[in-house]
């Protein structure tokens, strides 16, 4: 395997880093979150108790 010059490794590292950052930014901003309605997703009945001390 031929040796590569250090400047080549540096360029490859920067290209990989920039690609990784762009990929992560695109995944972060392209994610569309659609929340469910709270009344349908949570069926919790609250019992109100009046404590008389």
Curated annotation (Swiss-Prot):
GO cellular component: mitochondrial membrane; proton-transporting ATP synthase complex
A molecular function (GO) term: proton transmembrane transporter activity
InterPro entries named among the record's database cross-references: ATP8_metazoa (IPR001421)
Xref: Pfam families: ATP-synt_8
Record keywords, A-Z: ATP synthesis, CF(0), Hydrogen ion transport, Ion transport, Membrane, Mitochondrion, Transmembrane, Transmembrane helix, Transport
Described function: Mitochondrial membrane ATP synthase (F(1)F(0) ATP synthase or Complex V) produces ATP from ADP in the presence of a proton gradient across the membrane which is generated by electron transport complexes of the respiratory chain. F-type ATPases consist of two structural domains, F(1) - containing the extramembraneous catalytic core and F(0) - containing the membrane proton channel, linked together by a central stalk and a peripheral stalk. During catalysis, ATP synthesis in the catalytic domain of F(1) is coupled via a rotary mechanism of the central stalk subunits to proton translocation.
Subunit structure: F-type ATPases have 2 components, CF(1) - the catalytic core - and CF(0) - the membrane proton channel.
Protein name: ATP synthase protein 8
Protein's organism: Anopheles quadrimaculatus (Common malaria mosquito)
Name of the coding gene: mt:ATPase8
């Amino acid at each position: 395997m031929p040796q590569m010059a250090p400047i080549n490794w540096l360029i490859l590292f920067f290209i990989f880093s920039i690609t990784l950052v762009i990929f992560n930014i695109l995944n972060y901003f392209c994610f569309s979150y659609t929340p469910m309605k709270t009344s349908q997703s949570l069926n919790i009945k609250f019992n109100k108790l009046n404590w008389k001390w």
